[in-house]
Regions:
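N-terminal secretory signal peptides
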Residues: 1-10
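C-terminal segment of N-terminal export signals and the immediately downstream linker at the start
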Residues: 29-57
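Loop/turn elements at helix/coil->beta-strand transitions in domains of secreted/extracellular proteins
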Residues: 56-58, 90-94, 155-159, 215-216
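Solvent-exposed loop/turn segments at secondary-structure junctions
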Residues: 65-69, 100-105, 160, 165-170, ...
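Glycine-rich, aromatic-bearing surface loops/beta-hairpins
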Residues: 175-224
């Protein structure tokens, strides 16, 4: 088997396993629309997030720890390129690339509640002083710009990408805490991604593939 054929088979296998896991939990959460809407298995699927970046200026923001910084930087890039450099917003494409703890920002409220992610990530809901049972990044955060949220940035064309290796790691860690079987937890996570999120086999390989196609790279993780 040639390298290209082997690569195609591997991609089909990844996407088929993902679709099975998500379909098995369709009653618990929403399957990411980009994965559900397109036929699975085509070699281009793993690069679908790159394909949608058609502007003259394209950049990916890599975040591992502090997800909020990627939201603020996405907002600032779009605003400042438009207001200070005269670049039409449609010509400035931003992709937020997440792995590690940062993937919490792209998991829906149902998964936060079902898997007790607030307790796992040590996120406290200020209104209850208890572990959070919802994803705070989906609505305006006190003290932050009201438009620095995942839905608002998606509306402005920002692409959000999650690493599947990180999802597998998280599922194993939650299972080790007594949360259930790792494969079942993974299925919940995959089905519970915020609709519109792209799940890629490996984040670093995906970023390298994007750089090869001319997408700039910025590391946006910092204390905030």
């Amino acid at each position: 088997m040639s390298d290209s054929n082997a690569s195609s088979v591997a991609r089909r296998g990844f996407l088929f396993r993902l679709s099975q896991a998500a379909a098995g939990l369709a009653g618990l959460a929403v399957v990411p629309k980009e994965l559900a809407a397109e036929p699975l298995g085509a070699p281009a699927d793993v690069d679908a997030w790159i394909d949608r970046m058609k502007g003259q200026h394209r950049v990916m923001l890599h975040v591992h720890q502090n997800f909020i910084t990627s939201l603020l930087d996405s907002r600032n890039l779009l605003n400042n390129s438009r207001d200070l450099y005269g670049v039409p917003e449609a010509q400035y494409n931003v992709a937020v690339m997440t792995h590690g703890p940062a993937i919490q920002g792209l998991l829906g409220d149902d998964v936060w509640r079902q898997l007790a992610l607030g307790e796992y990530y040590k996120v406290t809901d200020k209104s209850t002083n208890a572990p959070a049972v919802r994803n705070a990044f989906l609505t305006p955060i006190e003290g932050e710009p009201a438009d620095a949220t995942v839905p608002e940035l998606m509306r402005r064309g920002v692409t959000f990408v999650v690493c599947n290796v990180a999802m597998r790691t998280l599922s194993k860690r939650l299972a080790a805490r007594g949360g259930g079987e790792a494969d079942a937890i993974y299925g919940q996570l995959a089905a519970g991604l915020v609709p519109g999120t792209f799940l890629v086999p490996d984040l670093f390989v995906s970023m390298q593939r994007a750089q090869k196609r001319g997408v700039a790279y910025l590391f946006t993780d910092r204390a905030h």
